[in-house]
Amino acid sequence: MSESLPRGEVEGPHAPRAAEPAPGDGTQLDPAAGPPPDSGLAIVSDSLPPVGVYGAPRPAVPQRLPLTPRFRGCGSGAGAGVGADAASPTGFRRLPDWLKVKLPGTGEYAGTKALLRRLRLHTVCEEARCPNLGHCWERGTATIMILGELCTRRCGFCAVAPGKPNGYVDWDEPRRVGEAVAEMGLRHTVITSVARDDLTDGGSTIFARVIGEIRRRSDTVIEVLIPDFRGHAQDLQRVIDARPEVINHNIETVARLHPVVRPSARYARSLDLLRQVKQSGAPIKVKSGIMLGLGEQQDEVMQTLRDLVAHGCELLTIGQYLRPTPQHLPVIEYVRPETFRWWGEQAHALGFESVASGPLVRSSFHADELAGTVRPGERSKTG
């Protein structure tokens, strides 16, 4: 393989931050009472009540941070988009044919988009610039992203906007997610989020409430793709207790590349999260995913797969890393489809129950088939 990426400095996890009140009328809320009905507002308090209510003064307005080149080898060309590459003067390189996808169409795509806009919901499909957006939305499916559109981390591979949410929580969001899932008639629902290190519970309370609101309105299978909650076991347990059918947490890359690819995460911490889900005894499938093309070596990928199996992972996705903008990590290699098929075979041999491996595979792509909700090729509704 090509030369691997340079090592970076390991950054410590973000400590919880108390947000400053926004300029306004100075109205103060009772922290013990939680957010007012229909306010959609909350802020981090010094201590989190058992039910996970944040409650306190009005929060500052969430602040989006600019994307700036953060990684050695990243270009600053005018172009941006899937497949951008520092080796090109414009920040792009030509994509191989197997990575080319058709543009979004109409019909179900337009209906899905209209529904999400009406209910003021974000999707990881849009925020992370997923290449499968057109395919999934035309099937009437989408992966809903909760807890806002600003992430408190700056991972080297991710297109989701970094920013300072300043403790903002939309308390009405769980209800709207429940309505969207019911209206779309989903049989398999995928919920994910940005990382919210500014919240004392990492956003786990909202995850639990979203699961509860979906349960009230639908008998859909619920899959959640969660952050690491900075290793806080009680926050993860809150999600486990809400009983989704699948908990997914992506390892993303091999151990050696974590300091560059996921500077605010830890390889061992992600493995521990998967182990905690498995050892909880809850009837929950454990899922993870890894990207190829960042400079990893074959033996490193194999060791990562072994580590995942050893920590209880049952479902696995393997996909190609595609550079979102010239400010993100460059693609070291475009892995061929036959190599992905080989990795899928290796993963099955190691003991994974179900594996999706291909250049365009993403965490929630055909998640229903991977989890066994429907048979491969059967027309389904998954989001």
Question: Where are the model-predicted features located?
Answer:
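A secondary-structure boundary/capping signal
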Residues: 126, 146-147, 192, 225, ...
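Local cysteine-cluster metal-coordination motifs and their immediate loop/turn environment
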Residues: 124-136, 147-162
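Glycine-biased, low-complexity coil/linker segments
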Residues: 8-10
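Core AdoMet radical
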Residues: 159-176, 181-274, 287, 291, ...
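Conserved functional loop/turn residues at catalytic and ligand-binding sites
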Residues: 150, 154, 159, 185, ...
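Short connector loops/turns at beta-strand edges and beta->alpha or beta->beta junctions
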Residues: 149-152, 186, 252-254, 321-323
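Auxiliary Fe-S-binding modules of radical SAM enzymes
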Residues: 1-3, 29-30, 34, 38-143, ...
